[in-house]
């Protein structure tokens, strides 16, 4: 279709970011990446020798380098006519500039630091993901991200002066520990809100086969995040490593029971094939025992809160080194402190 077609995936993503940004600006949730600007330009700026040398020679951000090299290989195969048809590139490209998340994606963070994360880290991160979905669905029940995998969620380091944060989600209040990080959902090129943000990508034959459609299903994104997170290609350590809290594993299996992890109800890529809303982000936050401590009106004992704060501060300080191996043996002892 035309580059000016608002239903093209690239344009639908931009429109979706604009629609969702109001939730951040109105302080209903901080967990959405904000757009800054977009423009069109020639692809030559990204594939010429100068660009290649500049990006590939950088020592930081191995993931970015790897993805760029893959892009160059596809581009060069395409212009030679050796690539598949979907590897052909237009000479004019659309560039989206967005808010920067300074700690990379959640998959990389988990892989680097899971051995040293506190139980409260897992709980708060999962709360943040579910809360932003619940907030969006509260106004747009038919919203679907459709690709909410762990590496499409970014992480931002935030100030930890304020020890607890108050969340308002679907007319309920939650008091949540400040762990020093905010997740930011990102990559909306499969996303849609029928009648508000329509997306041609979710009306094709191949997406229908994997249940990526515009049909309302508030469970779909929840299932896709948790079920793909524990797959072999992502973060299987979550279910196998003893350092991951058992209550977090039990929580995941309540949200995605065994019969919804593999089998006839699930595509080989981990996608949910039923139209059933097994549960919703709002119901999970309001009813599941995993988040009970965030709902309770009773303040936790001061000694326990202070201990959590100390351990969280220690984690943030050490994680700033960017090296997951720097944690000493004392940090492992923290596992006994919090649920």
Please report, for each region that a protein language model flagged, where it lies by residue:
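Conserved structural core of kinase catalytic domains
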Residues: 30-119
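Conserved kinase catalytic-core helix
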Residues: 20, 113-145, 150, 159-160
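Short coil/turn segments at secondary-structure boundaries
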Residues: 1-3, 47-51, 109-114, 196-201, ...
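Core residues of folded domains in eukaryotic genome-function proteins
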Residues: 29-34, 92-96, 127, 139-151, ...
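ATP-binding glycine-rich loop module of kinase domains
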Residues: 1-34, 38-47
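Catalytic activation segment of kinase domains across protein kinase-like and atypical kinase folds
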Residues: 142-218
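Helical subdomain adjoining the active site within ATP-dependent kinase catalytic cores
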Residues: 200, 209-339
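Conserved beta-strand elements of beta-rich interaction domains across eukaryotes
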Residues: 1, 40-43, 101-105, 160, ...
């Amino acid at each position: 279709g035309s580059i000016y077609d608002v239903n093209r995936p690239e344009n639908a993503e931009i429109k979706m970011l604009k629609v969702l940004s109001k939730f951040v600006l109105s302080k209903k949730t901080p967990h959405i990446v904000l757009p800054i600007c977009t423009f069109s330009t020639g692809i030559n700026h990204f594939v010429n020798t100068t660009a290649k040398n500049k990006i590939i020679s950088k020592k930081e951000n191995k993931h970015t380098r790897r993805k760029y090299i893959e892009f160059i290989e596809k581009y060069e195969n395409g212009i030679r006519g050796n690539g598949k048809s979907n590897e052909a590139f237009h000479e004019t490209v659309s560039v989206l500039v967005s808010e920067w998340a300074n700690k990379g994606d959640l998959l990389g963070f988990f892989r680097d630091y899971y051995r040293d994360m506190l139980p409260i880290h897992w709980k708060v991160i999962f709360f943040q993901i579910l809360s932003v979905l619940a907030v969006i669905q509260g106004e747009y029940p038919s919203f679907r991200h459709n690709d909410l995998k762990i590496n499409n969620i970014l992480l931002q380091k935030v100030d930890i002066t304020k020890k607890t944060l108050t969340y308002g989600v679907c007319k309920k209040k939650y008091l949540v520990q400040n762990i020093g990080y905010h997740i930011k959902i990102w990559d909306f090129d499969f996303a849609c809100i029928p009648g508000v943000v329509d997306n041609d990508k979710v009306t094709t034959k191949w997406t229908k086969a994997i249940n990526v459609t515009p049909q309302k299903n508030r469970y779909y994104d929840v299932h896709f995040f948790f079920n793909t997170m524990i797959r072999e290609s992502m973060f299987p350590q979550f279910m196998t490593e003893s350092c991951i809290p058992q209550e977090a594993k039990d929580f995941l299996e309540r949200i995605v029971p065994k019969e919804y992890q593999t089998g006839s109800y699930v595509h080989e890529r981990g996608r949910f094939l039923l139209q059933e809303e097994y549960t919703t982000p709002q119901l999970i936050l309001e009813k599941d025992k995993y988040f009970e401590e965030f709902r309770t009106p009773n303040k936790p004992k001061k000694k326990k809160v202070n201990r959590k704060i100390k351990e969280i501060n220690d984690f943030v300080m050490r994680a700033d080194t960017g090296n997951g191996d720097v944690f000493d043996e004392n940090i492992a002892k923290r596992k006994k402190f919090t649920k």
